[in-house]
Amino acid sequence: MRHGMSGRKLNRDKSARKALFVSLANALLKHEQIKTTLPKAKDARPIVEKLITLGKRGDLHARRQAYAFLRDDKVVAKLFAVIGPRYKERQGGYCRVLKAGFRYGDCAPMAIIELVDRDLAAKGTDSGPTADKKADADEE
């Protein structure tokens, strides 16, 4: 019996699942709205909300905890400089998951996960390369 077991395995082992949620959290905090499958969105939501709560705290220990999970300086800087202060008065519920139909090909249920009071003017703008792309460019 599976009483009391929360979360989904998503057909991955533990390390692949952690990498998936790190990637989803980075993308959501960078772009403030992403499209993914419904189970991934439902599982990523509490992770991102805990990161935003760290951003609201704003102290050094919270910043180090966020960096230990995200591993991207620019996303952590945005989390603490922009996103954290934006939700200073809101007590939780920073993300919403909207159902977005089914994917053509495998009919997987899709969802849009977005930050609640996101910046609509920034939609579609790219906030620059990620840390991985920058490191690859420096090596070449």
UniProtKB/Swiss-Prot annotation:
SUPFAM superfamilies: Prokaryotic ribosomal protein L17. PROSITE patterns: RIBOSOMAL_L17. GO terms for biological process: translation. GO terms for molecular function: structural constituent of ribosome. Pfam families: Ribosomal_L17. One of its GO terms (cellular component) is cytosolic large ribosomal subunit. Keywords: Ribonucleoprotein, Ribosomal protein. The keyword Nucleus does not apply. It comes from the Bacteria. Part of the 50S ribosomal subunit. Contacts protein L32. Belongs to the bacterial ribosomal protein bL17 family. This is Large ribosomal subunit protein bL17. It comes from Paramagnetospirillum magneticum (strain ATCC 700264 / AMB-1) (Magnetospirillum magneticum).
